Regions:
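Short, well-structured alpha-helical segments
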Residues: 237-252
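Alpha-helical transmembrane bundle of multi-pass membrane proteins
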Residues: 1-232, 249-511
């Protein structure tokens, strides 16, 4: 059996450092959401890009079209860059694509800070979306491909924590500057966007490229060096390299090259691609994006006292859920958490929010109730849906097609986010339908349908190595059999005598 002393966090400290640097990417993504969502409720910003509206709670408003484009162009840019991620990853690698994202982020921010015209602002939002698409896609790929199976779930929980923590920091910065009467109200938050990409750009110089990507390129010596850097001192990295190489070679036996259409030509790869796409879309299906993107504006128009402070409370609630989830992940399967505790609860809270506002709209008491319910909803979403959807989506693709599959899945996930952020202003803006919190009526059935999909189609791969997951998909197991299936003499090895990339498979609890 493997030496437990080689499989501790302390033994893997260099891998934790590398992944700790990379998770600054989702922090940047969350920071952008937190900052931009609050700008649209700042008088200092609305004096430039909005119009005076005495009938609204803050005395200012922004047109539905501008509101749509400012928020949704970022997700549109993320959709575009994620769609093309497979092509970039095939030649450039994970780190190089993240370096490109840092540069795009800096250029976009220069444009947004120096203009007072709407069109350059749109261009800046699109460019920063391109950067965010790379940040989210390639940081996930790097973590999936470098972390040992035992800690993959932990790293992805940290990934989601950093996204939420970034959002919280963004909302706190907005709250601190919101009452400034001039352009500094939003220029200070925008200036903060430079910090993370600058640090990330320099820090990535000191960590290795993904070993799986290097091996996929045939650069075995470089892959071995990367594994030696990432793994404990006495780990059997030669064995791990051979396992990765054998798994890749086995997949490539049926194809002479790799292209985007390969995701759908083979029934096994088609299944894995659709599962990855479906897992990412769970976030959009929960309806969370309109609250995340417009929470300060949403609270302001619902006449909530101090909407920026309440946005901080909402972000903090989501962050607490992520921390609590890190203790849950060890005990419960992802499928159960996603199904029972995530989608169903989130859908019910969306329905309760809508009904509560429908019965007594516009009162301060209703506003306080909405904040409390929104916090509970965000805890359910962050702790149970967001924590697992990206994780599962990254585990589903085959190693040969991982860049293409996850890139397309991320792109469609961003497309879903774009659709919500683009259409939400029609529903919540007083100058349009003015539904406000009634928007929750749409998301209750969406959550229930998503929960049904998870129950019937999404397999449980908790504790499995990427090579073991490949073997189970190749055997065409039904989703319900993944949890209890025992692998003997297949990719990934047996349950005993695991290498450094393998992990004990916990005894599966019954559904």
């Amino acid at each position: 059996m493997s030496d437990p002393s080689k499989d501790t966090i302390r033994a893997h400290w260099k891998c934790f450092v590398a992944c700790g640097i990379i998770v600054l990417s989702p922090f940047q993504y969350g920071l952008d959401f937190g900052l931009i969502g609050g700008l649209q409720a700042m008088p200092g910003f609305l004096k430039i890009y909005g119009y005076r509206a005495p009938e609204t709670a803050i005395g200012w408003n922004i047109s539905t079209t501008r509101q749509q484009l400012i928020s949704s162009l970022m997700t549109l840019g993320a959709f575009i860059s994620s769609s093309l991620a497979g092509f970039a990853a095939a030649k450039l690698g994970r780190r190089m694509c993240l370096w490109i994202a840092c540069l795009l982020c800096a250029v976009a921010n220069i444009i947004m800070m120096t203009t007072t015209h709407i069109v350059p602002l749109y261009i800046g939002r699109l460019l920063i979306g391109l950067a965010n698409g790379y940040f989210m896609t390639f940081s996930q790929l790097y973590i999936q491909e470098t972390s040992p199976a035992k800690y993959r779930g932990l790293f992805l929980s940290i990934f989601q924590f950093c996204t939420s923590f970034g959002t919280l920091i963004g909302t706190i910065i907005d709250w601190a500057t919101a009452k400034r009467p001039d352009r500094s109200a939003y220029l200070i938050p925008l200036a903060i966007i430079y910090v993370v990409p600058a640090f990330l750009f320099v820090a990535m110089i000191f960590i290795p490229e993904s070993p799986r990507w290097l091996i996929l390129q045939g650069r075995y010596d470089d892959g071995l060096k990367s594994l030696k850097w990432l793994r404990p001192k006495n780990a059997d990295v030669d064995k791990e390299l051979n396992e990765i190489r054998d798994a890749i070679n086995k997949e490539q036996e049926t194809a002479s090259g790799v292209g985007i259409l390969d995701m759908f030509n083979n029934p096994v790869d088609r299944r894995r691609t659709l599962l990855s796409i479906g897992a990412v879309l769970l976030q959009a299906a929960s309806g969370s994006m309109f609250i995340i993107a417009y929470k300060a504006y949403f609270f302001a128009m619902a006449k909530v006292d101090d909407p920026f402070a309440m946005s901080n409370v909402l972000s903090m609630a989501g962050l607490i859920a992520i921390i609590a989830n890190s203790f849950i992940v060890v005990r419960y399967g992802r499928r159960r958490v996603l199904l029972i505790n995530g989608l169903v609860i989130s859908g019910c809270f969306q329905l309760i929010i809508a009904v509560t506002y429908d019965k007594n709209p516009g009162s301060h008491v209703t506003g306080r109730v909405l904040v409390a319910l929104s916090c509970l909803y965000m805890m359910a979403y962050n702790g149970m849906i967001a924590s697992y959807s990206w994780l599962v989506a990254g585990e589903m693709p085959s190693q040969r097609l991982r860049s293409y599959t996850f890139g397309v899945a991320a792109a469609i996930g961003f497309l879903g986010a774009w659709l919500i952020t683009f259409t939400a202003p029609y529903f919540i803006n007083p100058s349009s339908l003015n539904w406000g919190p009634r928007y929750g009526y749409i998301w209750f059935p969406s959550c229930i349908v998503s929960a049904i999909w998870v129950f019937f189609f999404l397999p449980e791969v908790k504790g499995r190595t990427l090579e073991e997951i490949d073997a189970m998909f190749n055997k065409k197991l039904p989703a319900r059999h993944f949890r209890t299936h025992k692998l003997e003499g297949e990719a990934g090895g047996e349950a005993q005598g695991k290498s450094s990339v393998e992990v004990e498979v916990h005894e599966a609890e019954k559904v």
